[in-house]
Curated annotation (Swiss-Prot):
Coiled coil: none
Gene Ontology BP annotations: response to hydroperoxide
Pfam families (alphabetical): H2O2_YaaD
Gene Ontology CC annotations of this record: cytosol
PANTHER family (UniProt xref): PEROXIDE STRESS RESISTANCE PROTEIN YAAA, PEROXIDE STRESS RESPONSE PROTEIN YAAA
Protein name: UPF0246 protein Caul_4480
Organism of provenance: Caulobacter sp. (strain K31)
Disulfide bridge positions per record: none
Family: Belongs to the UPF0246 family.
């Protein structure tokens, strides 16, 4: 079983309390190609591209000027990302054996890096997958990555006892996984809140629940997707009546 999650816009480069290995991102040629493109962008370009403030545009312009794909330094990706998904995952509290298990069973999708393993060295950046960044390969990052992300996931999951790819990513990021090139069976998890007679997905809760699901799998060393149906953290439970073989629904009473 292989899980995929989205990255986060916010980052925390505070060093973890424990010494952890640092691995090299797998898609260095593509990362270098994108780095050349982003280095040429002005702060104003970045502001328009990602609809961000002048302050954030200036920060990320500076980041891209100093970004060097050939330098193997940074912080472990699963530690550095700091959004809602990662609040649910809380990787800083995982011990090394748990993180080593995650290195084999968890992948982070990224606009700049394509696919990251938990220990992969991350340098500070912001480049959303939905950004319409023009490259020699096309009009946006979906064109740029093409089949690459899917093929990388195929290689990561093919030798697992259960090759199922568990989608815990957003539509923006999972959209970069070419469905025709992907050879792994896919299960997408949906997290819904019940209020009155209505079930709905609420962004903040859903993001945190995706991280909690990944943490549940890591803590319990779940290597077959079927085991995820036992997820019961924060009041969620699997709803067979709302699920299909490819889409699993977990619901709870809205807090």
């Amino acid at each position: 079983m292989l899980m995929v999650i989205s990255p986060a816009k916010s980052l925390d480069f505070t060093a973890p309390d424990q010494v952890l290995p640092l691995t090299t991102p797998e898609l260095k040629p593509q990362i270098a190609e994108l780095a050349k493109v982003t280095r040429k962008l002005t702060a104003a370009d970045l502001r328009r591209l990602m609809h961000i403030s002048e302050k954030l545009a200036a920060l990320n312009h500076e980041r891209f000027q100093h970004f060097d794909p050939q330098v193997e330094e940074g912080l472990q990706a699963v530690i550095a990302f700091n959004g809602d998904v990662y609040a649910g995952l809380n990787a800083r509290e995982l011990d090394r054996p748990a993180l080593e298990w995650a290195q084999d069973h968890l992948r982070i999708l990224s606009g700049l890096y394509g696919v990251l393993r938990p220990f992969d060295a991350l340098q500070a950046y912001r480049l959303e997958m939905g950004a319409r960044l023009k490259t020699k390969r096309g009009a946006n990052l979906y064109d740029f990555w093409g089949e690459t992300i899917a093929k990388t996931l195929n290689a990561a999951g093919k030798d697992h006892a259960d090759p199922t790819l568990v989608n815990l990513a957003s539509q923006e990021y999972f959209g970069a996984v070419d469905a025709k090139a992907l050879k792994l069976p896919v299960v997408t998890c949906h997290f819904k809140e019940e209020k009155g007679n209505t079930l709905r997905v609420l962004g903040f809760f859903a993001k945190k629940a995706r991280g909690r699901m990944a943490r549940f799998a890591i803590d319990n060393r779940i290597d077959k997707a079927e085991g995820l149906k036992g997820f019961n953290l924060d009041g969620y439970e699997y709803r067979a009546d709302l699920s299909t073989p490819a889409d699993w629904v977990f619901a709870r009473l809205q807090p």
